[in-house]
A protein has these predicted regions:
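Terminal low-complexity tails and localization/encapsulation signals of metabolic enzymes
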Residues: 1-34, 67, 71
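Glycine-rich loop-to-alpha-helix module at the N-terminal edge of alpha/beta enzyme cores
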Residues: 32-107
């Protein structure tokens, strides 16, 4: 069974209290993973990390921001099939719809 974690400040972390919730495939009703059951303290930590990161982003040049966004797009494209499978499983969408309507527009 898969175990998902929060991604905060460049690191994968569990909920601060260690609690998890089941992740269920909506097409079968079967649990296929667990995810952190994040609370207010987890949200506050993520918000602080995002605000701190924004300082660097805000002060970067448009060229640097553009290059960073292109690198993100390249990474999404390189792992496209993985994202398609995850999104289909998470939402219960057919893979074909996810492949044509969800992931490509992100890139």
């Amino acid at each position: 069974m898969k175990t998902y974690r929060n991604f905060v400040n460049g690191q994968y972390v569990d909920a601060s209290d260690g609690k998890t919730i089941p992740v269920v495939d909506p097409t079968t009703g079967e649990q296929y993973a667990t995810a952190p059951n994040s609370g207010a303290a987890d949200v506050d930590a993520a918000m602080k990390a995002a605000a701190d990161a924004f300082e660097t982003w805000r002060d970067s040049t448009p060229k640097d921001r553009s290059l960073a966004l292109f690198r993100i797009a390249d990474a999404i494209e390189a792992r496209g099939e993985e994202f398609i499978a995850l999104e289909s499983e998470n939402c219960g969408k057919p893979v074909g719809i996810t492949r044509s309507e969800e992931i490509p527009p992100m890139v």
